[in-house]
Amino acid sequence: ELQYCVHDLIKRKKMARFIDPRVDWAFKRIFGSEDTKECLITFLNGLFEDELVIKDVTFAKTEKLGLRPDDRGVVFDVYCITNEGKHVIVEMQKKEQEYFADRALYYTARAIVQQGIRGIWDYHLAPVYTVCFMDFVSQSPILKEFRTDLVLTDLQTRQRVSDRMRIVYLQLQLLDKHMEAACMDIFDG
C-alpha cells in the first residue's frame, strides 16, 4: 500500500519525478502533512488491519520539551491523534543507531506520560502506537524479521495485558525477503 500512496502523492502534487521516502523531509511530507494525510490513514489501516479503523487524524505538535529543565526533549517525525483518540507516532530511521529500540520505547513512553493531567484524573490512557521504519537491519536478537510487533505481554501466559502500547518495527532492508516469502505462501496454497 505504501507504494501506491507514494505514487498517488507524486501524481497529485506533481512533485519531483522521484521522491525517496527514507529521506527525512520527504518522509515528513508524505506522512505528516494535511494534504497527504489520506496516505498515512491508508497505510496505518493496512498495517493495523482488523485492529484500527482510522477515518481521520489530527496532526499534533512534533516537538515535546523535557518534563524537567534537565530532561531531554523529543522530536517525533510524525505525531497524530486518530478520530478515536488513539495516539500514533511514525518514525523513519535511515542510519543504524545502537539503541534505536530504546529510543522508540522512550518516544512511546513520552506520548503515554504526556496524557497525565493535573487535578482529578482516573488514569485512563489512550493507546499509543509507534511505527518505526528502519532502513537498516538491526543487530538486536529480537528484531530479526521484516515486521516485529511489541506489546505488553505476560511472560508465563503469553497473553497481552494491555492494549495501551504497541511498537511496530519495519526493517526495510528485509522487505524483499518478506515479500518473497509471502508470495511463496500464496502459491503453495
Placement of each model-derived feature along the sequence:
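Elongated, amphipathic alpha-helical interaction scaffolds
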Residues: L2-G189
